[in-house]
């Protein structure tokens, strides 16, 4: 049931685009925080009410946000630093800006399981999987991405045990605030839902595989590394997707500390906002699609299978 969401409705004033068009914004203290920033949303808001211009990021700022949103930023800057912190961390990523022919030569010389990512894509898209050989569909897709976006991110395929993430907020003062853990589920490699539980329960799930000290080490270093990278460039929510992986012999667990850097509000932030108090039961927030998307929040028992949420 979503009846418990009514507690938040008193804090929200809904405005239609027509109402926003007529609203006088000349003497108002306003901060706009969309799900994520890009030129499309800035142009859309400006078209609704020209007075919004003073509250919008400049074109230069939007370009900077786009550059940081490029998957190569996390792959080439954040991930290598985090992995160097401990032998219990794992993760490798290559950013190719070579010709399509050289990329194909790489796969011919190094047959294995790979994850291929476009530098920019909407959530859950722009990702392909290679199983030892590149089929014609993936060849064409990679050629198009190289031509349109100028690069490809190539990563090893890992044996995933648990998907989760850490959620943050970047302030105007250049400080990074840790908001909490996000333990989420996927279906057919796409997001499907989040566990709603207090931090102790979520930490307990992850700690079945990796120590809390390792999580704290990763969290602290994400805050310190991105504080300097984001200062004066980005203000708002962001999340870092992670995963617990196992070795080929399934005897050792390691933490991949940066599968994705999402420079926007995430469903993990939504889950944190809806998470219960310490004494409330666990819930599962699920997104289903029939004729349209549906959000459902249901109770889950203590026998929840933690690695298959």
Residue ranges and their predicted role:
Residues 2-5, 41-49, 125-128, 164-165, ...:
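A short acidic (Asp/Glu
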Residues 111, 138-192, 239, 243-258, ...:
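Phosphate-binding site of ATP-dependent enzymes
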Residues 229-239, 287-289:
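Flexible, glycine/charged-enriched surface loops at secondary-structure junctions
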């Amino acid at each position: 049931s979503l009846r418990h969401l009514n507690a938040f409705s008193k804090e929200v004033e809904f405005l239609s685009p027509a109402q926003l068009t007529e609203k006088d914004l000349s003497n108002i203290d306003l901060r706009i925080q969309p799900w994520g920033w890009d030129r499309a949303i800035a142009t859309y808001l400006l078209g609704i009410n020209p007075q919004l211009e003073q509250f919008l990021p400049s074109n230069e700022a939007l370009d900077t946000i786009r550059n940081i949103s490029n998957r190569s930023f996390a792959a080439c800057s954040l991930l290598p630093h985090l992995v160097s912190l401990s032998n219990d961390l794992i993760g490798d990523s290559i950013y190719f800006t070579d010709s399509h022919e050289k990329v194909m030569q790489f796969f011919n010389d190094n047959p294995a399981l790979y994850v291929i990512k476009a530098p920019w894509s909407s959530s859950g898209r722009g990702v392909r999987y290679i199983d030892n050989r590149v089929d014609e569909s993936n060849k064409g897709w990679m050629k198009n991405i190289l031509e349109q976006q100028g690069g490809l991110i190539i990563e090893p395929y890992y044996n995933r045990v648990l998907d989760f993430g850490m959620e943050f907020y970047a302030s105007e003062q250049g400080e990074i605030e840790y908001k909490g853990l996000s333990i989420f589920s996927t279906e057919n490699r796409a997001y499907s839902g989040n566990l709603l539980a207090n931090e102790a329960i979520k930490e307990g799930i992850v700690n079945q595989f990796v120590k809390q000290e390792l999580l704290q080490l990763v969290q602290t270093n994400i805050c310190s590394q991105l504080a300097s990278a984001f200062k004066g460039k980005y203000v708002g929510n962001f999340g870092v997707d992670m995963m617990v992986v196992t070795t080929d012999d399934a005897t050792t667990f390691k933490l991949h500390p940066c599968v994705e850097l999402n420079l926007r509000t995430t469903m993990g932030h939504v889950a944190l906002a809806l998470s219960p108090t310490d004494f409330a039961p666990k819930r599962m927030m699920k997104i289903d699609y029939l004729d349209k998307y549906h959000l459902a929040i249901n109770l889950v028992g203590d026998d929840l299978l933690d690695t298959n949420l």
